[in-house]
Amino acid sequence: MFWNKISGVYDFVENIFNGKVNKEITQYVASLTDGNDDVLECACGTGMFSLPIARRCRSLIATDFAVGMLAQAQKKCRHQPNVIFKKADITSLGNADESFDKVVAANVIHLLDDPRKAMDELWRVCRRGGVIIIPTYINKSSKSASLAAKFFNMLGAGFKREFDEESYHEFFKQMGYAVSEYHTADGRMPCCAAIIRKMK
């Protein structure tokens, strides 16, 4: 699997190419959690979001389909006793309905064959009054962003779709999810976080 193969160098490449964006978006997402929150993170990767979230929330279950990525995330969060790591499929989570206050799925929607199924699962496990947070890399008109996507695809990332800001907004509208706000960290490859609130 591509993500297992690159798990050992993923952070190095990401930090060199897009470190400013990653720092801003992870801090923003973590700021949406607090000490009373039980959080589920899907597609946690190497733990880029996991560590700052774990430092703020009550509990975090961090999941990924790639065991290599999970191993890197576990190393990164080894001093956080409130984190549990599990292998899981974002389209078929084993958690009970309405189990989490915050549900995070970063940089994964564009990789999925069936993003609607994933969105429905994220909605299912989010508690009423909770928040679903979906940060995703988007393209802008600059050459560097599109080249980055092509580079990762060439290595085997298998992007199913690419978004710019407009098409990312339209993506959620077409699926019937009302996004209360968007937050974009700008840089070489911007990252836009969609915030979906599940009303009580």
Q: Which residues make up each language-model segment?
A:
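Short alpha-helix
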Residues: 160-176
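Acidic carboxylate diad motif detector
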Residues: 134-136
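Class I SAM-dependent methyltransferase SAM/SAH-binding core
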Residues: 40-92
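A short acidic, Gly/Pro-enriched loop at the edge of an enzyme's catalytic core
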Residues: 91-103
